[in-house]
Every structure is written in structure tokens, then in C-alpha cells.
Amino acid sequence: MKIALSFLFLTSTFSNAGKIGRLQSVAVSGQLNCLGKPAVGVRIDLMESDNNGEETGIIDDNDFMGYTYTDSAGFFNMSGSEVEISGIEPYVNIFHKCNDGLSPCQRQLRVDIPKSATASGPAPNETFSIGTLELSSRKVIGERRSCAYRNLTQTS
């Protein structure tokens, strides 16, 4: 009996990718501006941190949950899901060229999403809003440079 219950528990926690854990999801929205105007065509990646904010890959690579681009008004809305044993730690990476001059590649801004915004199952109950962000600020905590999307074109 114990073996059967253990088997049922383990098989109920597998995802289609073969991971052990439970399916969790998150939705996020916001508006991005550049110099007071909508930041159009900015790429946003929805990620899940597997190494407590350190993007070293020592523990486990961070999980990619999807991407989108801002619309003509600078808005974005996206959701994603991931199987994890513990609670997911979602964040978005925003890749942009706002107020960047001729610098190579893009500015990359990480915005963490609180665990309280996550839900069990494939679809989140609510959408977490990061609000309106002005990307032209020169010194932003959590920002670095990225050449992941070299051909990214966007307007402001």
C-alpha cells in the first residue's frame, strides 16, 4: 500500500518535461517608457531563478518561461509556468537601448516578481503589475549589459 501511494505521489508530480515538482505559474504586466514616450518593441523575457539570483549556473540554469515585446503604447502582458519542487522565483529581463547612445548591445534590467504573485497550476489567478518604468535612468539597480539580442530594433 505504501509503495502504491508513493508511486501515485511521484507520478503526479512529473511534468511533460520529466521534471519532479509541481506546476506553478505567474503573469506579469507593465508599461515601459523611454524619455517620457512609450518604449516600443522592447523585448521582455520571463525567467525563473534556480540559483537565488546568481546567474552562474552552478546550482541549475535559470528557466526560460517565455518572451514578448512591448506594443505601440509601451505595454506588455505575459504569463508562464514552470515545474519546481519548491516555490518558483520569477523575474523579467528587459532588454533595451533607451538613452544608450552608441554603446554596443543592450541594457538589461532585471525586475524580480514577488513569490506572492505566483500560483499553483498552469494558469495564474492574477497578473502582477510592475507599473510604469522609465528606462532612460542612467544608474539602475539590477542593470547590466547583454549582447543576447544584437539585432534588436526598437523605437521610443
From Swiss-Prot:
- Main site of residence? secreted
Q: Which domain of life is it from?
A: Eukaryota
**Cellular component terms per the entry's GO annotation:** cell surface; extracellular region
Name the Pfam families on file: TTR-52 (PF01060)
Write down the glycosylated positions: N151
Q: Which InterPro entries match?
A: Transthyretin-like, Transthyretin-like_sf
The family note in this entry says:
Belongs to the nematode transthyretin-like family.
Q: Return the protein name.
A: Transthyretin-like protein 1
What does the UniProt entry say about where the protein is found? Secreted
**Which keywords label this protein?**
Glycoprotein, Secreted, Signal
Residues making up the signal peptide according to the UniProt record: 1-17
